[in-house]
Regions:
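Ligand-binding pocket scaffold of soluble enzyme catalytic domains
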Residues: 13-15, 32, 58, 164-166, ...
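Core-facing hydrophobic residues within beta-strands of well-ordered domains
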Residues: 23-24, 57-60, 160, 210
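Gly/Ser/Thr-rich phosphate-binding loop
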Residues: 1-49, 61, 69
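Short, acidic, Ser/Thr-enriched surface-loop or helix-capping motifs
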Residues: 66-67, 75, 122-123, 221-222
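Short coil-to-beta-strand transition motifs
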Residues: 53-59, 114
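AMP-binding/adenylate-forming catalytic core of the ANL superfamily
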Residues: 86, 112-208, 223, 227, ...
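Conserved ATP/PPi-binding loop(s) of AMP-dependent carboxylate-activating enzymes
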Residues: 56-57, 70-110, 240-241
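General small-molecule cofactor/ligand-binding pocket signal
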Residues: 27, 63, 213-216
Length: 264
């Protein structure tokens, strides 16, 4: 069984092995349409650890870099990169006659290094944990936090259907805003808000705790089913959204405009 599109939570690993089949190979995989394949993926010959992708693809020089362009240590988070050319790497973009769009997409963060745009952690098992997209990571108090770290806590709460988390610029810092939809449209009262914050604080850290938790009628998604954190972040900062046509339910974006709770 292969899973892709977003990080596979620990609880989902547990569900598969307890409810579907005990001796199945469950592989969380990650790569891209642009490279027609995976950078990190499953491996039939090594152990499956819940919450982790087992290893890197053969023939691809995958690494995890610090912001300074050095390899991270196990347990540290950083940027997913490829240090050498690989067979399925795109060579140009259609209509990009001088190659500048191509270079900007992959090679501006680190010189001559493919920067994939994912925030990732290498584990002591030689595996990887996807922490979210690089451009949607949160940075409260200068600490980088992957959005998936918060999602893994929220999706296990019985009265929540799903959530979307973004960072809002606030008083020379960033504050975390968590938007949620509730099951059967339940009210999000103070007790529920406290329970969400308590769970995140206990299982993550005080830095992960959202400053505000706001109930919304729906979460915007792309036509391929991915939640659109960047679009929501732009809306709450009053910035234009460039590719609204890629959103499956653009009508829900109106709700995020001019929210009184987010007035600075």
């Amino acid at each position: 069984i292969a899973s892709t599109g977003s990080p596979l939570a620990e609880e989902s690993f547990k569900y598969v092995y307890e409810n579907i089949k005990q001796d199945v190979h469950l592989a969380s995989i990650a790569g891209g349409t642009d490279l027609v394949g995976c950078l990190v993926l499953g491996n039939l010959y090594s152990n499956v650890h819940k919450g982790e992708i087992q290893g890197q693809s053969l023939g691809i020089d995958v690494d995890v870099f610090t912001d300074g362009g050095k390899s991270t240590k196990d347990g540290d988070k950083g940027e997913l990169v490829v240090k050498k050319p690989f067979p399925s790497m795109p060579v140009k973009f259609w209509g990009d006659s001088n190659g500048q769009k191509y270079l900007k997409a992959y090679f501006t963060r680190f010189k001559n290094i493919w920067h994939h745009g994912d925030f990732i952690e290498r584990t002591s098992n030689n595996g990887f944990i996807m922490r979210g997209r690089s451009d949607s990571t949160l940075n409260p108090g200068g600490v980088r936090i992957g959005t998936s770290e918060i999602y893994q806590q929220v999706e296990d709460i019985d009265f929540i259907t799903e959530g979307l988390v973004v960072g809002q610029d606030f008083k020379d810092d960033v504050r975390i805003i968590l938007f949620v939809t509730t099951k059967n449209n339940q009210e999000l009262d103070n007790e529920k808000v406290k329970s969400i914050k308590s769970r995140i604080r206990k299982n993550c850290s005080p830095k992960h705790v959202p400053s505000l938790i706001i109930k919304v009628p729906a979460i915007p998604r792309t036509k391929s089913g991915k939640i659109v954190e960047i679009a929501v972040r732009k809306i709450i900062h009053g910035e234009p959204i460039n590719n609204k046509e890629a959103i499956a339910n653009p009508e829900v974006l109106k709700f995020f405009e001019n929210l009184p709770q987010l007035k600075l």
